[in-house]
Amino acid sequence: MDIQFLGAAGTVTGSKYLVRAGNERLLVDCGLFQGFKPLRLRNWEKPPVDPSAVGAVVLTHAHIDHSGYLPVLVKKGFRGRVYCTEATADLCRILLPDSARLAEEDAERANRHGYSKHHPALPLYTERDAEAALGHLVTVPWGHDFEPVAGLRASFASGSWFSCRRSP
């Protein structure tokens, strides 16, 4: 098993960690980069891992820098499950569509006032993309073991902490 840091390294946003175990790929968190423009531009780059090769995502919590890239991942081909606690799912159902709405409003405003160098300015993702991502959520109770991908066991503990280990 190995882990690759795809975000939140050198910065505190864009949390994404790829766990590889044999042929399986698990993404821990799927966050947006936030802050100065060079960081935000990373959200528009080609995904750091082929979304269709990721078997599952585990969200430690709902903050946008941990969950906000999910609509992009789904739009680009992710078809697996997104495991999280009920509280995280509840918050994602608010945060992801709201984030999309804000991005759509920003793009509309940029187009109306002509201040974007992109013509037309587009949102990173839409409310429809956010709703599609929410369809992948699977809730897991605190302290219960689950197998997000073959060969890996995980469980959520208090706060935003979770454990991941090889299956026996």
Where are these regions (language model features)?
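Core dinuclear metal-dependent hydrolase active-site scaffold
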Residues: 1-52, 132-168
